[in-house]
């Protein structure tokens, strides 16, 4: 059994840092109308919360702008489909996107290389084909899979990247040479595993702790086979009664052998691990809880008790 705490964490952070009350606006009224229309046409308000949750899980995300029939579109790209090639202290300016396709029994990889040059943004498309998903394969013309796609496309006069990379506010202590982010739970993997071990053990408690009644085998119904031998049979679907043979059958009484459940011990262990996880993530103690014994709190109490959680959400924003 698993608690899926990693997803719970990412969903919680996503709702804290982006909600329906969020507003995106531009000072210039003309551009503001354009931006609002682009966001609306690309289902930004519906798709971004889920996309943001994945970004917390994967260590980042990219929103890429492209044209489709002269209409501005947004592509929500997971961090594992992007590799940066050039960056500065502010942002990633160049990078390669990778997309996988399957057609006619072949596996294709389309690489989209974004570069900033003196005359504008240059985008190069490179297509590779392979018989196996595991191999990069050989280079083939882009037209083999995309007849209308050009090898190179230039957006003259554009001096800003046509994509925006963002990442969680978690220092990357695993890869120092790349400006990439880490999943918010990257340094809490051991704790997440421990939580799942405890939760799995709790589930096993209910399986192993089912009612068990020991009975002498003489109490089991019997039938006679074709040879006239007595054969005892037992309902294999019955999980309550357990039959035993004994040398001294009269001393073997019907007895309840049900084991008591160790629910309290498991819950306390889960609470401890969840508090450790909250500390590792930067949440306030008790933010992640297995049960709720605190009752209703006022807004002032919530703000006081969860100041670390509120501070963490502001950092990610």
Where are these regions (language model features)?
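Extended, helix-rich architectural segments
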Residues: 1-93
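Exposed, low-complexity/repetitive linear segments and helix-based recognition motifs
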Residues: 8, 97, 109, 128, ...
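Generic hydrophobic, helix-prone segments enriched in Leu/Val/Ile
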Residues: 12-13, 51-58, 105, 109-116, ...
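A general structural signal for short secondary-structure junctions and capping/turn motifs
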Residues: 52-57, 103, 115-116, 154-155, ...
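Extended, regular secondary-structure scaffolds
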Residues: 62-181
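Extended, charged amphipathic alpha-helical segments
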Residues: 145-308
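A motif-centric signal for short, conserved binding hotspots located
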Residues: 312
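Conserved small/polar residues in nucleotide/adenosyl-binding loops
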Residues: 315-317
């Amino acid at each position: 059994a698993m608690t899926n705490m990693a997803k719970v964490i990412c969903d919680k952070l996503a709702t804290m840092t982006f909600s329906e009350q969020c507003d995106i606006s531009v000072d210039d009224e003309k551009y503001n109308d354009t931006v609002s229309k682009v966001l609306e046409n690309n289902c930004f308000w519906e798709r971004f919360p889920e996309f943001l949750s994945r970004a917390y899980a994967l260590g980042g995300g990219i929103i890429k702008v492209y044209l489709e029939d002269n209409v501005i579109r947004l592509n929500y790209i997971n961090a594992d489909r992007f590799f940066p090639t050039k960056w500065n202290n502010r942002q990633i300016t160049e990078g390669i996107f990778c997309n996988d396709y399957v057609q006619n029994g072949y596996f294709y990889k389309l690489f989209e290389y974004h570069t900033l040059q003196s005359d504008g943004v240059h985008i190069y498309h490179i297509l590779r084909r392979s018989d196996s998903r595991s191999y990069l394969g050989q280079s083939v013309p882009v037209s083999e899979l995309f007849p209308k796609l050009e090898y190179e496309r230039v957006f003259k006069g554009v001096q800003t990247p046509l994509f925006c990379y963002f990442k969680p506010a978690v220092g990357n202590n695993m890869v120092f040479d790349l400006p990439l982010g880490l999943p918010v739970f990257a340094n809490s993997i051991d704790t997440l595993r421990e939580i799942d071990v405890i939760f799995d053990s709790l589930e096993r408690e209910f399986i192993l702790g089912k009612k068990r009644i020991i009975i002498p085998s003489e109490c089991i119904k019997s039938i006679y086979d074709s040879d006239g031998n007595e054969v005892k049979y037992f309902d294999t679907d019955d999980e309550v009664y357990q039959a035993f043979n004994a040398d001294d059958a009269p001393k073997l009484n019907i007895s309840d052998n049900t084991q008591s459940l160790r629910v309290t011990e498991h819950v306390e262990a889960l609470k401890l691990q969840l508090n450790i996880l909250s500390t590792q993530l930067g949440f306030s103690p008790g933010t992640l809880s297995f049960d709720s014994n605190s009752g209703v709190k006022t807004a002032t109490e919530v703000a006081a008790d969860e100041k670390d959680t509120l501070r963490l959400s502001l950092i990610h924003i």
